[in-house]
Structures are given as structure tokens and as C-alpha cells.
């Protein structure tokens, strides 16, 4: 029987995949899934394997005909399972889905290797096929009339900051991500042309081992991660792919420059890309990020950096064995050798542990650098462990210049002695790493909600007896802050009465004052509403003894704040103290998540576009170089989508060679999970930023702008009429989605709400999007869009042609609609209807039906404007991938909806089935069940629910 079924998975896949788009994808998919099913049968017997395949078949039937009776049939099968079997089935489907995702990634890399894809085709939602190849981009710019020298100059002045954040609806655990990487690797090698029979056998065994190890690992995090865990998680990518990926990528840039006739390398002091992090610095609504956490995270990253550099310097000591050097280097080597430290035998080194002979001057100098790095690492380790170290500050590197100086001396000496080719080897790579990563590997941004700083200043003014700062109007606040900033008197009295929140803000500032300033990026103020929010942070930094204050970055994220942002920025620039203080540079962060939650995706996207244009004009007027910091989520609902399309659709004149972008927890894996992906991501950010500056997208025609403006108003009204004003909405949302159960997933270190209680407004943007993604309804992304299109076409039939023209000619509008189409490709109103049918009260069902009708109407209007007969007709690869992925997701959706029903309604009748797995057939109490919730929920239901959540998140690929 198993062998018949074995054939059917391949046959099922072929029946599902439209046309013969990619034979490899079907082969890879079938290979991995069949291997998994064999393992499942070995471990748990044939009954379980058959059951899992039957589920896939029923789901595949539903996908083909959209016959909703199939969902009921599937639900009846799944609800009767014994608790242990339910967990196994959910886990099996989740693993099959993960394997399908890996097959897609390998097929994609394979396809990219075989042919450079045509520009602008984005057939993986995360970013991977969107080719923004650096070589092609440079050639294209030259063909558009730029001189190679202009391109080189633009590159030298460019900077991209990637900011890793820990919003980990990164639903997978690190233990599993590493196993996935090894599965991907086996599959890649198996598909190589020159694989021998012996290799194939060994790779087959390795593949079997890794798939089984992944299946035997608990997918559920049993404890909520701390901010320190999140930071280590983010750092593992820096460590494993980015550290070596950066010099490799910069060499590719050198090659690309050579190809357009530039015969010099990119200078090593031009780090095209820098890395920053919010993990351990983002305290907005996260009480777990304390001043101690921030201190720990900074020391930990300095320790990791020193460790990585020690290895690089040792490799370099092997390489630089030359004796020829310039006089300056020889004199320095003699100076080093005359110190007592150089005489000692250092037994804790494996290489070069005795005194280095004087005829190896480069090694002598690098030996001293290594000693200092060793001390740097040990001091950080002591401070982390005990808060104290006997190693003095003089014996360690505290400033990047101290570290660079001996390395630059070696570089200069090699070049002067005719050894430039050697200088441009590992030494150049190391210099580039030092300029990219500094002594702290990543700079830590600090983020805090504006209200917290207001609390502190209010406590100070009240204590000083000059009134309550909180009750002052904005003008009075500004006037007082400026006069204090210009004055010298200390404001922070030692006896200031402090609440826990106030102590936290001041404690964090004091940590900034005690640690090396190069550990930190800017200080970001979330929910920023007025210029006084910025000056308040400047004043507090000064009061807490921060000598070199962090740049302060306002984050505008709600619709009204975005509309007021240009005026706020102008007010800051027209304040003489501030404009003199910032040295001609300002960063402003724009938030995609909360603006989308506040007004819907279309209006948020447009308001972000306009706010950026206006702020760029203000900055130009005051002669300030503005860097916009884009707080994009991984999901489309939170501003996500393919990287280079997002950058190229920004308004002209808003990037000018410098941009900051958040890389959210859930997409770090897709962008930096392995070397090839990391290389592509670095290319894509660099190429798109360069292209945007040198060949900006078109500005919208006045009539497009006017129509967009009017549609945004209609879209916001429609969105808010449902989400904010409709009295039934909150109850409907809570019952039709797993929002209430979401908090149990141990997804991240921060709570799901900003404040306890309340409706949609207090819910964070992530659980809001995550909940709608789970039911495949994606409401926040499309709600309001259909109403806006309909209004425009009803108002004047000519607008239909105008919308088509906007889609074809205006990058911003096209990207907005293409991303929407991708979301519709993953949505399914039939599935959303199942949740309604099972979970929603009778009186709310008509409301759910109305919303589903709006979904269908919006989808049809979108297709007409884009000129597509069918969803994703322009992207056959993504379409095929989704067809193969959907049956797994549908099974998980049905499982989730029925599990929620059983959790919420204990009287729901279930017909029990006999045990499926041979492992649990004779046991009453299955192992491995964890009750997260006391006795309220029958055993196994919570684990099953969490597995379905993780699986659906993995299947959607742009989660929360």
C-alpha cells in the first residue's frame, strides 16, 4: 500500500502544478517529502503515513475545485485523533511544508545559477529572485549616459544601514534553522551534475539523518526568549554568514567596477553596508529590556567582535611572512620588540606562541595587535561575568582608530615595497571588516516611546517647582527645553522621586554614558508626535553625562503623525540650538506597521510617500542631509516585500545614497540564512540604492497624485468604518482569528499589547497582522482598497484608464498593487469562511460574509486594473510554488479552526479514532505533552494549535 501511496505524492504534485513550469521543483519536492514519509512510516508505522497522505489528498482536492465540503470532510478526520496522534499529524504536515519551502529555495538558487533571471521578476516573496545584480546595475547606469567616474564617486559616498530587529514571528527555532541549512546543502549537492555514486549514497544518508533529526526536535519554544537570547539569535547570522560575506561581496563590487573601466578598488574606508541591531536596545513597550540587558548585550557583542578579529589576525600572521618593509614599520617593530610584553611566552595561543623573530616585522606588529585583542575580549568577558576586570583600559582597544593604525601601517608598507598584490589579499579584507563592523560588530540602536521621556522631564519640572511639563503646550515646552540646552545648570537632582519607568529611562541613559560610544547607533523615539520629543531626549542625554550624545531620531508611525511630520522637522531645523548641534545630518524614521494598522495599507503607503517627499524638501531648504530610516516589517501588511522593488519605488530625491532599513526577525533567515542568500541581499541593497540615486523613478503626474490623494481618503474611511467604528468588529476579530491564543506562542520577548485591556488600538501591529495571516484573510492589507478603486471608477469611467496607466508607468503604484496581488494569491476566503462557521456567533456571521464579499470584489478590481486574467499570471514560478505549498497550509488551517473550536467550546462533539502511531498505541499517557495552561484545555490541543500557527506562518513566508 505504501508504495502505491508513494507514487501518488508525485502524481498529486504534478496534478496540482499548473503547466510544466519547473520540473526541478516537483522533483526536489517529491524527493524530500517521500523521504520524510518513509521516516514517518519507520518511526510510527504505516497507518500514520497513510493518514497524513490522505489529508494532503483531500486538501489538494479542495485546492483544485474549491469545494468547501472537502474542508468539513478533512475536519471530521482530524478532530477524532487522540492527543498524541494530533500532535504528530500537525508536526508531520509542518515538516512537509518546511521541506517544500526548502525545495523552493534550492530550485530558485539552481535556476539563478543557470541563467541570470530577467530583471524585475519576483518569484519568491522574500526577495531572492529579484535580481538587482551589482554588475548589471553598473553597466546599465553607464549605458544610460553616466560616466564610470560618476558611478564610482556615487558608490564611494553611499551608505546602507541594515538594522536587525527581534520581532521574531521568526516562528522557527534556531536548532531547526541549522538543520534546514544542512538539508538545503544536501539537496544542492545531490542535484549537482558531477555527483558520483558513492557521493550520492552518502548524501542520501545525510539527508535522511537531517530530516529525521529535524522531525525529532520539538518545534515549540518552551520558554519565552529573553532579549539576550534574541540578540544571540541575530548575532549568529553575523557570525555565520555576514562576517565573511561582506569582504566577498566588496570584492565583487571591485570586479564590477573593473568591468566598467575603473582600475582601482573601492577604498577600504568605504563600508557600503553597515549592521545595527535593536536586540537589547528596543525598550518600546518591552519591560524586559532593562539597563542591565543593554549593558550585557553591548559587552557581549564587543566580546564576539574581538573573538572574530583574533582569528582573522592569526590567519594574517601566517600570510604576512615577508621581511621587506618600509622604515616606519621596521622602527615600530623594533619598538614592539623592546617592550617586556613581547618577550613573554604565551602558552594560551596555539600559533605564534613564542617570541617572533625580528626578521618577520609584519608578524611582530600583528602579534601586538593580537595581544591587545585578546585583552579586549577578556576584559569584556570579565565585565559581563562579574562587573569588574583587572585588565586596565589602556591594555585594550577602546577606539577603532587604535585598531586600524597598525593595520594601515602594514598596508602602506606592503604597497611601498612593491607588494600591493599581497596587501590587497586578506589584509584588505580585514581592513574592510574593521570599517564595516567596528569594535562592536553591530551598533545597538536605543528605542523608547516618547511618553517615557515626557514622564522624566515632568518629574524634574514638578520637583523643581516650576509646574507640570506634561500640561504645558508645545511652544512652552520648546522654549523651556531650548533655554535649558543653552544653559549650563544641572537639572537632575539626586533626590528626584522616581517611578520604575523613570528609573529605567535614566538607568538606560547612564549605561550609554559608561560604555564606549561606538557601541551605539541613534536614539529612536517611537510614537513621536512633536519636535519637543526630540529636544527632551537631547536634554536628558546631556543630564546623564553622555559626552558624545547619540543622534536622536523621531519615528513617525500613525497617520496623523506622518501628516504632521514635515512641519515637526521644519520646526526642529528652524531652532538655532538644534541646527547647530546636528552638524548638517538628520535621520528620520517612518513606520509602516502602525500606520497600516491605523489607516489600512493603501492610505499608509501613500501617506508615507508624501511625508518622505515633503521632509526631503524641508531638509534641502535647511541644507541638511536627510537619511530616511524605513521601519518595514517582513509582511506586506507591515511594509514588507521584495527589497529592491521597495527601494526603487521610493519617491525621487529621498534616498540620495543613504538609507537605513530594518531587517525583521522573521525575514533575517530568508535574507542572510546562508552564504548565497547573504551575498544576494548585500548586492540588492547596494545596487538598488545606487540606481535610485543615479536613475531616480519618475515623479507622479499631477493628475495621478490627485486621484491617489482622493482614493487614500476613501480607503481610510472605509477601513476605519469597519475596524474602528463598526461595533461588532472587535468581537468578530477576537472570535474569527486565533488572536486571543497568540500570546501563548513564546514568539518574542515583548508582550502582544502596549497596554493591558482595550480594543484594536492597544494591540501591537504584529499580532494584529499575524492573526489575519493565520486565517488566510489578510484583512489589513486589502480592506479599503476595493472601495477606493470602485469610488474612482464610479466617479468617472475615464479613471479606469488612468489607473491602468498609473500601474504601468509609476513604480510606486505598481509595487503597491503587485504586493497586494501576491497577498491575494496566498489568501483564501473559503478558509476564512470555515473559521467563521465554526467560531463566530450566529449574529456575527452576516458581518463576516459581507467582509468576504468585499475581499472578492477587491481582488477582481485589482486584476482588471493590472490587466491580468488570473492571479499571478505574470509570475508562473511563484504560482507553481504556491500551488504545491497550499495543500499543506489548508490542512493546517482546517486543523487550527477545529482545534480552536475544541479549546473554546469543550462541549463540541468529537468521534474518537483508534490510535494511529505504533509508538503510542499501547500508552495511555503520551510523552512530551506540555500543558501551558493548567487544566483548562484537554491535553494536546495547545501543542497542536501552536504547531498549526507555526506551520501557517512558515507557509505564508511573510508572517507577522
UniProtKB/Swiss-Prot annotation:
Regulation: By light-reversible phosphorylation.
Protein origin, superkingdom: Eukaryota
Native source species: Sorghum bicolor
Compartments, as annotated in UniProt: Cytoplasm
Single GO MF descriptor: phosphoenolpyruvate carboxylase activity
Protein name (database record): Phosphoenolpyruvate carboxylase 3
GO biological process, one term: tricarboxylic acid cycle
Similarity section: Belongs to the PEPCase type 1 family.
Enzyme Commission number(s): 4.1.1.31
InterPro entries listed in its UniProt record: PEP_COase, PEP_COase_bac/pln-type, PEP_COase_Lys_AS, PEPCASE_His_AS, Pyrv/PenolPyrv_kinase-like_dom
Gene3D superfamilies with a match to the protein in the record: Phosphoenolpyruvate/pyruvate domain
UniProt entry tagged with the keyword Phosphoprotein: yes
Amino acid at each position: 500500500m505504501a508504495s502505491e501511496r508513494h507514487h501518488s505524492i508525485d502524481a498529486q504534485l504534478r496534478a496540482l502544478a499548473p503547466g510544466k513550469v519547473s520540473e526541478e521543483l516537483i522533483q526536489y519536492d517529491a524527493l524530500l517529502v517521500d523521504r520524510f514519509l518513509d521516516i514517518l512510516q519507520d518511526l510510527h508505522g504505516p497507518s500514520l503515513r497513510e493518514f497524513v497522505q490522505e489529508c494532503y489528498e483531500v486538501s489538494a482536492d479542495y485546492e483544485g475545485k474549491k469545494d468547501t465540503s472537502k474542508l468539513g470532510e478533512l475536519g471530521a478526520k482530524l478532530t477524532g485523533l487522540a492527543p498524541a496522534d494530533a500532535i504528530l499529524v500537525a508536526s508531520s504536515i509542518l515538516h512537509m511544508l518546511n521541506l517544500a519551502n526548502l525545495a523552493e529555495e534550492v530550485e530558485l538558487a539552481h535556476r539563478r545559477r543557470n541563467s541570470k533571471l530577467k530583471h524585475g521578476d519576483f518569484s519568491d516573496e522574500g526577495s531572492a529572485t529579484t535580481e538587482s545584480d551589482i554588475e548589471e546595475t553598473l553597466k546599465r547606469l553607464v549605458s544610460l549616459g553616466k560616466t564610470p567616474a560618476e558611478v564610482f564617486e556615487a558608490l564611494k559616498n553611499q551608505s546602507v544601514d541594515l538594522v536587525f530587529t527581534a520581532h521574531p514571528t521568526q516562528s522557527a527555532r534556531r536548532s531547526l534553522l541549522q538543520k534546514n541549512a544542512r538539508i538545503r546543502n544536501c539537496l544542492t549537492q545531490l542535484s549537482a551534475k558531477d555527483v558520483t555514486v558513492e557521493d550520492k549514497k552518502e548524501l542520501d544518508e545525510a539527508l535522511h539523518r537531517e530530516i529525521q533529526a529535524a522531525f525529532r526536535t520539538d518545534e515549540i519554544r518552551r520558554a519565552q526568549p529573553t532579549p539576550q537570547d534574541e540578540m544571540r539569535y541575530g548575532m549568529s547570522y553575523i557570525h555565520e554568514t555576514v562576517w565573511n560575506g561582506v569582504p566577498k561581496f566588496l570584492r565583487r563590487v571591485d570586479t564590477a567596477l573593473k568591468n566598467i573601466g575603473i582600475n582601482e578598488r573601492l577604498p577600504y574606508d568605504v563600508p557600503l553596508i553597515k549592521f545595527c541591531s535593536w536586540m537589547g536596545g528596543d525598550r518600546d513597550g518591552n519591560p524586559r529590556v532593562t539597563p542591565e540587558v543593554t549593558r550585557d548585550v553591548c559587552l557581549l557583542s564587543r566580546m564576539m567582535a574581538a573573538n572574530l578579529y583574533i582569528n582573522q589576525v592569526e590567519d594574517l600572521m601566517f600570510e604576512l611572512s615577508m621581511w621587506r618593509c618600509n622604515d616606519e614599520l621596521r622602527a615600530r617593530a623594533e619598538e614592539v620588540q623592546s617592550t617586556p610584553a613581547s618577550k613573554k611566552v604565551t602558552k594560551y595561543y596555539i600559533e605564534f606562541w613564542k617570541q617572533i623573530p625580528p626578521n618577520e616585522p609584519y608578524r611582530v606588529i600583528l602579534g601586538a595587535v593580537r595581544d591587545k585583542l585578546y585583552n579586549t575580549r577578556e576584559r569584556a568577558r570579565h565585565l559581563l561575568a562579574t562587573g569588574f576586570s583587572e585588565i586596565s583600559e589602556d591594555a585594550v582597544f577602546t577606539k577603532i582608530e587604535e585598531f586600524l593604525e597598525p593595520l594601515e601601517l602594514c598596508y602602506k608598507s606592503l604597497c611601498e615595497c612593491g607588494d600591493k598584490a599581497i596587501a590587497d589579499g586578506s589584509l584588505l579584507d580585514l581592513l574592510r571588516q574593521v570599517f564595516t563592523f567596528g569594535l562592536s560588530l553591530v551598533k545597538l540602536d536605543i528605542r523608547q516611546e516618547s511618553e517615557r521621556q515626557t514622564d522624566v522631564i515632568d518629574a524634574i519640572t514638578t520637583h523643581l517647582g516650576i509646574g507640570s511639563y506634561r500640561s504645558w503646550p508645545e511652544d512652552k515646552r520648546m522654549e523651556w527645553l531650548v533655554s535649558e540646552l543653552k544653559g549650563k545648570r544641572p537639572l537632575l537632582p539626586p533626590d528626584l522621586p522616581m517611578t520604575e519607568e523613570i528609573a529605567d529611562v535614566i538607568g538606560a541613559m547612564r549605561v550609554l554614558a559608561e560604555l564606549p560610544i561606538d557601541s551605539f547607533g541613534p536614539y529612536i523615539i517611537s510614537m513621536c508626535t512633536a519636535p519637543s520629543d526630540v529636544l527632551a531626549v537631547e536634554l536628558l542625554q546631556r543630564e546623564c553625562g553622555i559626552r558624545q550624545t547619540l543622534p536622536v531620531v523621531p519615528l513617525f508611525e500613525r497617520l496623523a503623525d506622518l501628516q504632521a511630520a514635515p512641519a515637526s522637522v521644519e520646526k526642529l531645523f528652524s531652532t538655532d540650538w538644534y541646527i547647530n548641534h546636528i552638524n548638517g545630518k538628520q535621520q528620520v524614521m517612518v513606520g509602516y506597521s502602525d500606520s497600516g494598522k491605523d489607516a489600512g495599507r493603501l492610505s499608509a503607503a501613500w501617506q508615507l510617500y508624501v511625508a518622505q517627499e515633503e521632509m526631503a524638501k524641508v531638509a534641502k531648504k535647511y541644507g541638511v542631509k536627510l537619511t530616511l530610516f524605513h521601519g518595514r516589517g517582513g509582511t506586506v501588511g507591515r511594509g514588507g516585500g521584495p527589497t529592491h522593488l521597495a527601494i526603487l519605488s521610493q519617491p525621487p530625491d529621498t534616498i540620495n545614497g543613504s538609507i537605513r532599513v530594518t531587517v525583521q526577525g522573521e525575514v533575517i533567515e530568508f535574507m542572510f540564512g546562508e552564504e548565497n542568500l547573504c551575498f544576494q541581499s548585500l548586492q540588492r541593497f547596494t545596487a538598488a540604492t545606487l540606481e535610485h540615486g543615479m536613475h531616480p523613478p519618475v515623479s507622479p503626474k499631477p493628475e495621478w497624485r490627485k486621484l491617489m490623494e482622493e482614493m487614500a481618503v476613501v480607503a481610510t474611511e472605509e477601513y476605519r468604518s469597519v475596524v474602528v467604528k463598526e461595533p461588532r468588529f472587535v468581537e468578530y476579530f477576537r472570535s474569527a482569528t486565533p488572536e486571543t491564543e497568540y500570546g501563548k506562542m513564546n514568539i518574542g520577548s515583548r508582550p502582544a499589547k502596549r497596554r493591558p485591556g482595550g480594543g484594536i488600538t492597544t494591540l501591537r501591529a504584529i499580532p494584529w497582522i499575524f492573526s489575519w495571516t493565520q486565517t488566510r484573510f489578510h484583512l489589513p492589507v486589502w480592506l479599503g482598497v476595493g472601495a477606493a478603486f470602485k469610488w474612482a471608477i464610479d466617479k468617472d469611467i475615464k479613471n479606469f484608464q488612468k489607473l491602468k496607466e498609473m500601474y504601468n508607468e509609476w513604480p510606486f503604484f505598481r509595487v503597491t498593487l503587485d504586493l497586494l496581488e501576491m497577498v491575494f494569491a496566498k489568501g483564501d476566503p473559503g478558509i476564512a469562511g470555515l473559521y467563521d462557521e465554526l467560531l463566530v456567533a450566529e449574529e456575527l456571521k452576516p458581518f463576516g460574509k459581507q467582509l468576504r464579499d468585499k475581499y472578492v470584489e477587491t481582488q477582481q478590481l485589482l486584476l482588471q486594473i493590472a490587466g491580468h486574467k488570473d492571479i499571478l499570471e505574470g509570475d508562473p514560478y511563484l504560482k507553481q510554488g504556491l500551488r504545491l505549498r497550499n495543500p499543506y497550509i489548508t490542512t493546517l488551517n482546517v486543523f487550527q479552526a477545529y482545534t480552536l473550536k475544541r479549546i473554546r467550546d469543550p462541549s463540541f462533539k468529537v468521534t474518537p479514532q483508534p490510535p494511529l502511531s505504533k509508538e503510542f498505541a499501547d500508552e495511555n499517557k503520551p510523552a512530551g505533552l506540555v500543558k501551558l495552561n493548567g487544566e483548562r484545555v484537554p491535553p494536546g490541543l495547545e501543542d497542536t494549535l501552536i504547531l498549526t500557527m507555526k506551520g501557517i506562518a512558515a507557509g505564508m513566508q511573510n508572517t507577522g
